[in-house]
Amino acid sequence: MSSAQQQFERIAREVIEDSFRMDPVGATWMGEHAFDSLLPDLTKYGQEQFSQRIEGYLAALDAVDDVELALPDLVDLEILRAFLTSTYFDVTQVAAHTWNPMLWNPGTAIHLLLSRDFAPLEERMANVADRCENIPDFLEQARNTLEEMPAIHCETAIAQLAGTRALLESLDIQPQIIQSLDQHVEWLKEQLPFAHKSPRMGSE
């Protein structure tokens, strides 16, 4: 194995692990269960740190001597570069974590663990409990991160959170977790009169 191939494979492993850690719900959906106890870090600080790491990954890929790579590895390198470039755009330009309240709905994080029989129920329920315990802090982070929102996104998030509440009520969890969800829904309702952001991308 050439040094270039070793370098590329190391970068690829770091990118995959970092991406799964930043999106543990997506990781659960894709069948990677190392982060099943976590909720995403969608805070401004977390996303800024992630964007800086992406810049580092892209610089590291540029430093790989691709002349030494076999064709399959060269193709994989360009796929990884495209993924990082797209993710960087999403984080820094789209920045949906600052205006799309639907991203802050913890319901999918819980539902995936309950609906997929990938591990014994006891193990999955332990991760459900961990994710549920993080919900109050997660929703507080949402309120500290979300800025002006499109009305349609705000209204849809409120409707979807009703389903999340029903899901949480079916579980034996602490009442304050459901109360934190109710508090967040009330906050979203308070934001509706000011939710004038256009859902379209770009300035025109």
What do the PLM-derived regions correspond to, one by one?
Residues 1-204:
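N-terminal maturation segment of proteins
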